[in-house]
Amino acid sequence: MYSSTGLSSEQITDLVARIHDLREAPASRAGRKPTLGLYKCVVVALIYLRSNRTQASIADQFHVSQKTISRTIASWTPILGQALQDCTPTVDDLDVTDPLIVDGTLLPTWSWRSMPELYSGKHKTTGGNVQVACDLTGRLAFISDPMPGRTHDAHALKETGLLDHITTGQLIGDKGCIGLGMITPIRAQPHHHTEEEKRFNKSVNAIRYMIERVIANLKTWRILHTDYRRPFTTFPETITTVAALEFYRNTF
């Protein structure tokens, strides 16, 4: 179960119980018996978020129509997030004295012609810019809401509120964060670093590998790794849900 959903059977059972307590399960059409029960609806949504498989292939697995899977994903993805909203820390929940490593990542989407702001010149593709933070042990600490892909990491970081809440000297970033008061590698002309600067940059980069590993783990939810295919209006709620699931599975 874990390989297809990202959660253990015990975690799924607990998640189903949380949703049952919400009493917000989508109503079935009048006079119709639900095609999938609560447990299977949760599993379907998890499989989609974890693997980003086509709805048709998931429909074949559960012996239902593609439309049923489409409705299930649309209805239950936000419910998963609601059931786990207490698992996701906000900026205000973070310890102001806890050193954090921060980095931005692009979550790819389709190239909608009507949304040129999604194009990232840095990554040469379209998507949403998300800021991720972890502590010095590599524990995930924060995931921001998505911003348009063209947003520079420094601006995106300012928008998260992290710089206002955490002492900037406690934040570690890359060269894109130079000028924000954070600990970053030193920028110099090519081949003009002093030996001391080289040692400093090496020590910073040795720490920053933690956030790269955290982001890689986050993107094992393949819905965040490959082009997002559902309507863009559902993109923010999908990220919110996946963020909650990632925090949940790490703290259960």
Where are these regions (language model features)?
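Ser/Thr-centered flexible coil motifs
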Residues: S8, G37, H193-E196
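A short, structure-level motif marking secondary-structure boundaries and short turns
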Residues: A30, Y39-C41, F200
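Short secondary-structure transition/capping motifs
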Residues: S4, K33-P34, I47, F62-S65
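Charged, often Cys/His-bearing segments associated with DNA-binding zinc-finger transcription factors
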Residues: M1-A30
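Short, amphipathic alpha-helical "recognition" segments used to contact nucleic acids or chromatin
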Residues: G37-S51
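A short glycine/serine-rich beta->alpha loop
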Residues: A27-P34, Y228
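Short, well-ordered secondary-structure "scaffold" segments embedded in the functional core
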Residues: S57-F252
